[in-house]
Amino acid sequence: MATSTMSVCSSAYSDSWQVDACPESCCEPPCCATSCCAPAPCLTLVCTPVSCVSSPCCQAACEPSPCQSGCTSSCTPSCCQQSSCQPACCTSSPCQQACCVPVCCKPVCCVPVCCKPVCCKPICCVPVCSGASSSCCQQSSRQPACCTTSCCRPSSSVSLLCRPVCRSTCCVPIPSCCAPASTCQPSCCRPASCVSLLCRPTCSRLSSACCGLSSGQKSSC
């Protein structure tokens, strides 16, 4: 498919057919000239637009590096949904912000080596935590409401879901953190409860009233 053979290609400026030394696939790099890329052959896995002649994105997508700036700047969402802006874009080079927008970069192409918080939004792919990056552990739908960035230790970075490992600062008596019991007092929230991803409070033995109201707690707590 990559070899150059004598193929039948239609002219972009006439309805006549001519024999030209074009690769079998119209949208391979040597064949992206306007005289070779006709509307019909361009409906391939690489060139998604109807016509390579009228689409500057298709021209750039035919180059060895699919997600160059020339492609992403002129690319429409319909052009980037197929393979031209997928894994090669996010794996061969670090994810660029113009590349990893939700319409272009699918979760399959956001690998840990390329996913940086600045380029891979949660809708595109889940960020991969790094010890020096606290922006990964910001509030999101995947994290408990009571866990802030100060709860995220580097040890939580092993999870692709970026689930934070809570520190004692996480278990402050926040209503959404301290179980359903509305009468839960600060004495109910001990640092030991922070081993839970949900930051549910561990009842203090001195606060039997709170122990009785907190769901999921043992009555002998």
Swiss-Prot record:
Function: In the hair cortex, hair keratin intermediate filaments are embedded in an interfilamentous matrix, consisting of hair keratin-associated proteins (KRTAP), which are essential for the formation of a rigid and resistant hair shaft through their extensive disulfide bond cross-linking with abundant cysteine residues of hair keratins. The matrix proteins include the high-sulfur and high-glycine-tyrosine keratins.
Family per similarity comment: Belongs to the KRTAP type 10 family.
Protein name per Swiss-Prot or TrEMBL: Keratin-associated protein 10-3
Species classification: Eukaryota, Metazoa, Chordata, Craniata, Vertebrata
Domain of life: Eukaryota
Region (18 X 5 AA repeats of C-C-X(3)) location: 26-214
InterPro entries, per database record: KAP
One GO term describing the cellular component: keratin filament
Assembly: Interacts with hair keratins.
Keywords, ordered alphabetically: Keratin, Repeat
Sequence repeats: 26-30, 31-35, 36-40, 57-61, 79-83, 89-93, 99-103, 104-108, 109-113, 114-118, 119-123, 124-128, 136-140, 146-150, 151-155, 177-181, 188-192, 210-214
Annotated organism of origin: Homo sapiens (Human)
Tissue: Restricted to a narrow region of the hair fiber cuticle, lying approximately 20 cell layers above the apex of the dermal papilla of the hair root; not detected in any other tissues.
Pfam families: Keratin_B2_2 (PF13885)
